[in-house]
């Protein structure tokens, strides 16, 4: 039986795993500094796995942790929860050098918007897209 999160399988690509673990392009320039998704070290990814309830992690490359997290989230029907965790503002420690909190919030929102655009570009041929609506992430048919 297909689950509500089966559409997230379209994200099962190494390119997306690497992007989500912080090995992607800078997405926003603010006052001459460039920002993207947080860069997660292996130990941080391991901690994220534990926090999310995934206790048996094989490890290896950093992208493998993200792959296992996504597989687990799809299996457990918790993809929205996973993406809210990965995109939580508290994860963006790379923004801590911005002094003004309003600017931090603005840069954070811009990064999330650009990150979704980046992911959607990567999956565009599937005719599906990642959207963030009313505080929740979901995969929908393009234009719906």
Segments from the language model and where they lie:
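Charged interaction/catalytic cores of defense and host-pathogen modules
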Residues: 1-139
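Conserved N-terminal substructure of TIR/SEFIR domains
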Residues: 143-144
């Amino acid at each position: 039986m297909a689950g509500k999160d089966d559409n997230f399988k379209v994200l099962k690509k190494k390119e997306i795993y690497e992007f989500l673990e912080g090995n992607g392009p800078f997405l926003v320039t603010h006052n001459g500094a460039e920002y993207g998704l947080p860069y997660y070290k292996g130990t941080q990814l391991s901690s994220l796995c534990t926090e999310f309830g995934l206790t048996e992690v094989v490890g290896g490359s950093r992208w493998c942790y993200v792959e296992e997290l996504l597989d687990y989230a799809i299996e457990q029907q918790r993809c929205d929860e996973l993406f809210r965790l990965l995109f939580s503002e508290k994860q963006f420690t790379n923004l801590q050098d911005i002094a003004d909190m309003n600017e931090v919030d603005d840069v954070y929102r811009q990064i999330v918007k650009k990150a979704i655009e980046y992911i959607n570009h990567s999956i565009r041929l599937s005719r599906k897209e990642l959207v963030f609506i009313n505080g929740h992430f979901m995969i929908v048919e393009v234009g719906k």
